[in-house]
Regions:
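Conserved alpha/beta-hydrolase
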Residues: 47-68
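Alpha/beta-hydrolase active-site loop
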Residues: 69-89
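Gly/Ala-rich beta-loop-alpha elbow adjacent to hydrolase catalytic centers
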Residues: 97-106
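A conserved short beta-strand
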Residues: 114-125
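Short beta-strand/loop motif that positions the catalytic acidic residue
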Residues: 135, 140-147
């Protein structure tokens, strides 16, 4: 059962397993053009697959006001509003899951006090994006090996996400980098009818995300060792 709530920013969040002691906030990708936000097919598939097995975890899918990488601060404000929502509802810790452009959004708001860890799914991590907000957190990146640069999508590829991951690691951020063999860009797309169409290898996206979620549920990220 999902419930849609308005966020303070004007965006929306779709909640599953409300009132959990822990929370997962899922943020979507975007486009070059400023278009109204939509619900992410990949986030929806992951929520459908994982939420029943984690009844004590609230899943909050975010629909931006406008989804475009040319207005990242707006998308980040929407993600922060969702973090504030689950925090106010009593979530003790939050896992951010960002798909595509949502990877940049998640890293950009990772310093929020409720965030414990970030999972980037085929994430866009541009070289100009600061990653210092991840210090003291955890970053797990999952990327499809067959994901490549596409027209209009700036720098979404395993090579670029690995470079972003390595920048975070250089700051002492813990985490993992996983390539899904023959994996594409995410786990699902949406048909014109509105139904989900899983992409080849979608089960691998679910299972790798499940592992990250299990780790999150088991306990907070360890503090980095003193330099």
């Amino acid at each position: 059962m999902r419930r849609v709530l308005a966020l303070a920013s004007g965006a929306e969040a779709r909640l599953t397993n409300e009132h959990g002691a822990l929370a997962v906030v899922l943020v979507n990708g975007g486009t070059a053009r400023a278009v109204p936000g939509t619900w992410s097919a990949t986030s929806e598939l992951l929520t459908d697959a994982l939420a029943p097995g984690f009844p004590g975890v609230t899943f909050a899918e975010v629909r931006y006001r406008v989804k475009t990488w040319n207005e990242l601060p707006s998308c980040m404000a929407d993600a922060e509003a969702a973090l504030d929502l689950v925090d106010a509802a009593g979530a003790e810790r939050t896992l951010l899951v960002g798909f595509s452009m949502g990877g940049a959004v998640s890293i950009g708001v990772a310093a929020h006090p409720t965030v414990d860890a970030v999972v980037g799914l085929a994430p866009w991590i541009p070289a100009r994006l600061p990653v210092d907000g991840l210090v003291g957190k955890r970053l797990d990146v999952i990327h499809g090996a067959w994901d490549r640069w596409l027209p209009g999508i700036p720098g979404v590829s395993p090579t670029v996400s690995r470079q972003g991951f390595d920048r975070a690691r250089a700051l002492g951020v813990g985490g993992s980098y996983t390539l899904i063999p023959r994996g594409l860009h995410g786990a699902a797309v949406r048909r014109p009818s509105g139904e989900l169409q899983p992409l080849p290898g979608w089960r691998a996206w679910v299972e790798h995300t499940r592992v990250a979620l299990q780790r999150f549920v088991a306990g907070p990220a360890p503090s980095p060792a003193p330099a």
